[in-house]
């Protein structure tokens, strides 16, 4: 069951402030308050959906497509399209989801995490 008092629902309603990058009638993109990369943006659809499966299973394909199309536009706006980026969405407790509202993380300008081993 969807929790109307989750932090993203409050941000969408304007009850909690955020640093908005883009907003329209269906989506909101804003900076993460605890970034793990130089660019760390959260994207949320403005419909009451708990996770990815809830979003794609219970909402019109046009709403889902609009969200992902807008995600691509945000990636272009952030100028990370050519250099590489990550899109992450955790789902459920065992998937590491912390806020029970479907959202994505867009991470860019990350430091390399792999090491080259001398053999």
Task: Name what the model sees in each region.
Residues 1-119:
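HIT superfamily nucleotide-processing domains
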